[in-house]
């Protein structure tokens, strides 16, 4: 019996150690290019597959950042595609806004829904967003109910948050990458 308890205790300790390590994991940004744009992307903390994206296009002379995010959902209502091009109510750190649904696509056992927050001048936007993040010590988006819209019908997990400690250097690096695309492809 004593061996069994030691065995269970050791496994429980290892399990908790792995969980603690995952909870302390650093934010990891992906900075890359695709065709005529570069991007900086960070994964969500609640649902790792949800991403917060900052796209920079050569079409805008690498001066604008297009900010969007994705939510994955297992919910499969028959009318999920009707969300396309709709403005869905969200809360960003408790502030009520809307985000435009730009795509709904089958993914794994559910759907990936992409939302647009808009296009903004790069430096002004990322410094504003960084101040917003530092003020609240978080960057959280919650999909909420609205007029004729029940969030739970479409999204099983309605909240995610992202670490933005490396926002400024990551987006500025993507901006530099965009400028190399412009020069090398022109």
Feature names for model-found ranges:
Residues 23-186:
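A generic "folded-domain core" signal
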Residues 1-25:
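Classical Sec-dependent N-terminal signal peptides that target proteins to the secretory pathway
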């Amino acid at each position: 019996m004593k061996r069994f308890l030691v065995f269970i205790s050791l496994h429980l300790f290892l399990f908790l150690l792995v969980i603690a390590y995952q909870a302390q994991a650093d934010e990891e940004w992906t900075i890359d290019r695709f065709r005529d744009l570069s991007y900086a992307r960070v994964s969500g903390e609640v649902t790792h597959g949800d991403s917060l994206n900052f796209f920079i296009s050569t079409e805008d002379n690498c001066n604008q950042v297009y900010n969007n995010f994705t939510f994955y959902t297992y919910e499969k209502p028959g009318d999920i595609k009707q969300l396309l091009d709709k403005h869905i109510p969200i809360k960003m750190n408790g502030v009520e806004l809307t985000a435009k649904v730009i795509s709904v696509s089958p993914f794994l056992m559910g759907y990936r829904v992409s939302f647009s927050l808009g296009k903004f001048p790069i430096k002004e936007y990322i410094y504003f967003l960084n101040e917003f993040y530092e003020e609240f010590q978080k960057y959280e988006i919650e999909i909420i109910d609205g007029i004729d819209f029940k969030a739970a019908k479409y999204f099983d997990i309605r909240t995610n948050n992202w670490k933005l400690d490396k926002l400024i250097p990551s987006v500025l690096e993507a901006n530099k990458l965009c400028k190399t695309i412009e020069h090398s492809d022109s």
